[in-house]
């Protein structure tokens, strides 16, 4: 089963007639890397923001986004924060510390992760950069 499943997602911004997303379906399995490519205004950011309910834009939505079979919108915010990460297009809008290590540790620290576990997870993440 796909970890993230988007099924027939259609989204229309308020005051617009044309949907920004129309009948989008996508499966992403754990460990996969996915690149969304398209012109400016084609809906890439709008789609990604629907993976993180606190960032989802307001408007008319049909379809469903699930994580391991559960609608993302039904997950408690703490679970969403622990399981769903989001890197914005402009890093200046999201960087909160002045050191890469601290930036990688920020989310884990906010969740109360034990120091030893946090160090191991940050080291693991850092190998990708």
Q: Predicted segments — roles?
A:
Residues 37-40:
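The feature captures the beta-strand-to-loop junction immediately N-terminal to the Walker
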Residues 52:
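Helix-to-loop junction immediately C-terminal to a conserved catalytic motif
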Residues 114-129:
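Conserved ABC ATPase "signature" region
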Residues 60-71, 80:
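Conserved ABC transporter NBD signature motif
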Residues 1-6, 11-23, 55-58, 74-76, ...:
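A short, flexible loop at the N-terminus of ABC-type nucleotide-binding domains that lies
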Residues 16, 24-35:
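Pre-Walker A (P-loop) beta-loop-beta motif of ABC nucleotide-binding domains
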Residues 71-85, 110, 115:
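ABC ATPase NBD coupling module
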Residues 85, 92, 98-109, 119, ...:
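Short helical segment in ABC ATPase nucleotide-binding domains corresponding to the A-loop/adjacent helical element
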């Amino acid at each position: 089963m796909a970890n993230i499943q988007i099924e027939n997602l259609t989204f229309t911004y308020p005051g617009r007639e044309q949907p920004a997303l129309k009948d989008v379906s996508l499966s992403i399995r754990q460990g996969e890397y996915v690149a969304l490519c398209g012109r400016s205004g084609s809906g890439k950011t709008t789609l990604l923001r629907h993976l993180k309910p606190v960032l989802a834009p307001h408007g008319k939505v049909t379809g469903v986004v699930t994580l391991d079979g559960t609608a993302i919108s039904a997950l408690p915010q703490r679970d969403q924060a622990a399981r769903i990460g989001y890197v914005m297009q402009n890093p200046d809008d999201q960087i909160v510390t002045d050191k890469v290590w601290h930036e990688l540790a920020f989310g884990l620290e906010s969740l109360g992760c034990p120091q030893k576990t946090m160090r191991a997870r940050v080291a693991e993440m850092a190998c990708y950069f």
